[in-house]
């Protein structure tokens, strides 16, 4: 299982949210490039970045910092937040983004998902962000009537291979992930599932790994010191090689 440390960007800084609430954002680092470098030094093989300003506005807002991170760390980066059309996807892939995450656009525009998957295949991931099992969009401000499992199945049928699942009520809480919803999703589709939201310690990571989940995104638990990234990667890799 791959561990993806998270960088959430707001106005050029690293922040953490609580249950997706933009008003409750807290700056955890002034220099995201420094954070990314530290993640790399601690053994990260992949970094998860969200442009929170982009998620709200529908346009990438932190591109210069994201580009600097890519050039500086030289390990794969996946990016979500504000990606709404194929031109933006083209631009991001050209800029060196390894995997582009579609959320709002995927729910509102199935045609875009089809086009993007046809052109970029595994480089496209879908963010399935759920609130009470319904898919939330537009920076998690609006909750649709679409069930998260139904949405994931539809994305799989289009050809999507990677799904990032977040239970919004758990995000930033350090109360543990929603294992029931995660299990249901993993049993319902054959896509690679990356778990996000609420992971609080190494035990959570071990449980997720035992569920045969492809990856786990860890944010607040690293910034708060609950998880030592280097130690977590070593432990999870050791368990993988048994």
Swiss-Prot record:
The keyword Heme does not apply. Disulfide bonds: none annotated. One of its GO terms (cellular component) is cytoplasm. Its EC number is 5.3.1.16. It is found in: Cytoplasm. Pathway: Amino-acid biosynthesis; L-histidine biosynthesis; L-histidine from 5-phospho-alpha-D-ribose 1-diphosphate: step 4/9. This is 1-(5-phosphoribosyl)-5-[(5-phosphoribosylamino)methylideneamino] imidazole-4-carboxamide isomerase.
């Amino acid at each position: 299982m791959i561990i993806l440390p998270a960088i959430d960007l707001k106005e050029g800084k690293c922040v953490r949210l609580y249950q997706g609430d933009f008003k409750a954002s807290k700056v955890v680092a002034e220099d995201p490039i420094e954070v990314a470098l530290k993640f790399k030094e601690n053994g990260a093989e992949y970094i998860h970045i969200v442009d929170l300003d982009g998620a709200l506005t529908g346009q990438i807002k932190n591109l210069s910092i994201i580009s600097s991170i890519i050039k500086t760390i030289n390990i794969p980066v996946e990016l979500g937040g504000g990606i709404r059309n194929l031109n933006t996807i083209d631009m991001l892939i050209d800029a060196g983004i390894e995997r582009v995450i579609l959320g709002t656009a995927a729910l509102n525009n199935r045609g875009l998902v089809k086009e993007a998957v046809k052109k970029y295949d595994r480089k496209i991931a879908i963010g399935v962000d759920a609130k009470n099992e319904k898919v939330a969009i537009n920076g998690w401000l609006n909750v649709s009537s679409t069930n998260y499992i139904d949405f994931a199945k539809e994305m799989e049928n289009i050809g999507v291979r990677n799904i990032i699942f977040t239970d919004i009520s758990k995000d930033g809480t350090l109360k543990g992930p929603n294992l029931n919803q995660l299990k249901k999703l993993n049993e319902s589709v054959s896509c690679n599932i990356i778990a996000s939201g609420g992971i609080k310690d190494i035990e959570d990571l071990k449980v997720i790994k035992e569920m045969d989940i492809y990856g786990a995104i860890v944010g607040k638990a690293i910034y708060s010191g609950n998880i030592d990234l280097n130690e977590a990667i070593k432990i999870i890799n050791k368990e993988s090689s048994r």
